[in-house]
Amino acid sequence: MIALVIQPSSEADLEEPILEVEGLSVVRSGKLVIQDIDLTILKGEFVGIVGPNGSGKTTLLLSILGILNADSGQIKIYGSKPMSKNLDGKISWVSQAASNLPSDLRLTVRELVELGTLNRSNMFSRRRDKQQVDQAIEMVGLKDVENTDIGRLSGGQRQRAVIGRALASKAEFILLDEPLVGMDSESRSSLLKLLDDLCHDADKTILMVSHDLAAIRQTAHRMIYLEETIKFDGDTSIFPDLTELAELRGIKPVHDEVHGHHHHSHKGAGEDL
């Protein structure tokens, strides 16, 4: 009965599971890529996923989005299956291709962000859309370049514009796949601050995959180490250092700089996974 549907209080909201994954296994091209994944993400969490190349990080994201089918197990987002109609506008994906948009793309920042407002239910309410777009552009710090073509922006600015599109959609759950790729350290820091602000001030829930261990440590509340299955899931403050990670993987580390203050963006610096 409809009368029994009660809006939870904001206090209960804090414990509301946004994502529930149980016993998820996915086979791609005949190979088991992820197996027996159990994962629950609560409203307002910022969760980082790290792991070596080919460990199943992107596969997990694509499964959550419903782009890849599970071979076993189940996924629920806001209590619904991936791709359900009632998830329209609630979930948004920022892929690593965002910063590689073609340089001759004839689309301004504002036009790209506006795409986020289009869905089945709001095709005719342009006034509200404009307000959403203005707010999203402001939040990602691109007001000065809102009428500039995407192709003329730096990789970091492009990535911000794509996140702006996600914000304009009013999505509450944002998934990011390697959003820091190709960014200089200044762009990376400002993007991480933006994501942190979105969690704290805008009540978003974020799931981010990255090779950049130091960046995830700096921003995420909770970290997951994935290598086919989840080998660590806990508070960022107790995430293993590289020596302990090597033990998880059964390999010897080259060297460990995670607890130092070095923050290299290139591979082989001891910080990238």
Which role fits each region the language model picked out?
Residues 114, 127-145:
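Conserved ABC ATPase "signature" region
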